Amino acid sequence: CSGLSTCALMKLSQDLHRFNSYPRTNVGAGTP
């Protein structure tokens, strides 16, 4: 990671994608 902010953002993004994987919200499942 080049910067802490970038690292945190990337981790957050991964977590968000993980949550989107679950059939919790149709909106999340619709977006790649």
From Swiss-Prot:
Record key words, sorted: Amidation, Disulfide bond, Hormone, Secreted
Keyword Secreted set for record: yes
Superkingdom per UniProt: Eukaryota
UniProt key word Zinc: no
Modified sites of kind Proline amide: P32
An example Gene Ontology CC term for this record: extracellular region
Subcellular location: Secreted
GO molecular function, one term: hormone activity
Disulphide bonds in the chain: C1-C7
Annotated SMART domains: CALCITONIN
Function in brief: Causes a rapid but short-lived drop in the level of calcium and phosphate in blood by promoting the incorporation of those ions in the bones.
Entry similarity comment: Belongs to the calcitonin family.
Name the UniProt record assigns to this protein: Calcitonin
